[in-house]
């Protein structure tokens, strides 16, 4: 049996401020740092180890992974970073407060942008100061590869491309893998692994910094999945609450 651990980054500063974040590189809040330490302690107490780790090129996911591995005394584990594991790009919504955006455009429209799988928010323009193409971390991307906005289908496409080319082969070779990423990135992976319908993924929420374990067969088909707490597996349908750590 193969085990895969997925973890959404701890609470970020813009999660705290209720802003659309996307590819904006904001850091963890103090609460997010605590959540990451707690996740590492949970994994260590439950006897988990890893051979390789994957994350995005955004510091909230990277820092979460660093803290988790540090808490587990696994700082030596190789870490691979790739933009294809970035959060969904929210286009011109990035940086905007979600409540204020709902007042401006209407709650229904904002809900469609956030939760439909194939509707993109308004795009950034290339002269927008929020346009990240010139950031050094993206220097290998061609102009046509760089998103100005994304729907969940767009996010899923790049995430699964990286899954099939890099992560799945490691799992099939017996490596113990952890992925520290973002809400919509993990939603994309869960949709694929569990073969969820479009309606099923719309209502799917991924909590910050709670380890989600997938037990997979030799063909990487899921046997079962569950969240972890200090007390072990959490009953199906339940999500453990964070403790101060």
From Swiss-Prot:
<feature type="binding site">
    <location>
        <begin position="8"/>
        <end position="15"/>
    </location>
    <ligand>
        <name>substrate</name>
    </ligand>
</feature>
<feature type="binding site">
    <location>
        <position position="98"/>
    </location>
    <ligand>
        <name>substrate</name>
    </ligand>
</feature>
<feature type="active site" description="Proton donor/acceptor">
    <location>
        <position position="87"/>
    </location>
</feature>
<protein>
    <recommendedName>
        <fullName>2,3-bisphosphoglycerate-dependent phosphoglycerate mutase</fullName>
        <ecNumber>5.4.2.11</ecNumber>
    </recommendedName>
</protein>
<feature type="binding site">
    <location>
        <begin position="21"/>
        <end position="22"/>
    </location>
    <ligand>
        <name>substrate</name>
    </ligand>
</feature>
<dbReference type="GO" id="GO:0004619">
    <property type="term" value="F:phosphoglycerate mutase activity"/>
</dbReference>
<feature type="binding site">
    <location>
        <begin position="87"/>
        <end position="90"/>
    </location>
    <ligand>
        <name>substrate</name>
    </ligand>
</feature>
<dbReference type="InterPro" id="IPR029033">
    <property type="entry name" value="His_PPase_superfam"/>
</dbReference>
<feature type="binding site">
    <location>
        <begin position="114"/>
        <end position="115"/>
    </location>
    <ligand>
        <name>substrate</name>
    </ligand>
</feature>
<keyword id="KW-0312">Gluconeogenesis</keyword>
<feature type="binding site">
    <location>
        <position position="60"/>
    </location>
    <ligand>
        <name>substrate</name>
    </ligand>
</feature>
<comment type="similarity">
    <text>Belongs to the phosphoglycerate mutase family. BPG-dependent PGAM subfamily.</text>
</comment>
<dbReference type="InterPro" id="IPR013078">
    <property type="entry name" value="His_Pase_superF_clade-1"/>
</dbReference>
<dbReference type="InterPro" id="IPR001345">
    <property type="entry name" value="PG/BPGM_mutase_AS"/>
</dbReference>
<dbReference type="InterPro" id="IPR005952">
    <property type="entry name" value="Phosphogly_mut1"/>
</dbReference>
<feature type="binding site">
    <location>
        <begin position="183"/>
        <end position="184"/>
    </location>
    <ligand>
        <name>substrate</name>
    </ligand>
</feature>
<comment type="pathway">
    <text>Carbohydrate degradation; glycolysis; pyruvate from D-glyceraldehyde 3-phosphate: step 3/5.</text>
</comment>
<keyword id="KW-0324">Glycolysis</keyword>
<dbReference type="GO" id="GO:0006096">
    <property type="term" value="P:glycolytic process"/>
</dbReference>
<dbReference type="GO" id="GO:0006094">
    <property type="term" value="P:gluconeogenesis"/>
</dbReference>
<feature type="site" description="Transition state stabilizer">
    <location>
        <position position="182"/>
    </location>
</feature>
<keyword id="KW-0413">Isomerase</keyword>
<feature type="active site" description="Tele-phosphohistidine intermediate">
    <location>
        <position position="9"/>
    </location>
</feature>
<comment type="function">
    <text>Catalyzes the interconversion of 2-phosphoglycerate and 3-phosphoglycerate.</text>
</comment>
<dbReference type="Pfam" id="PF00300">
    <property type="entry name" value="His_Phos_1"/>
</dbReference>
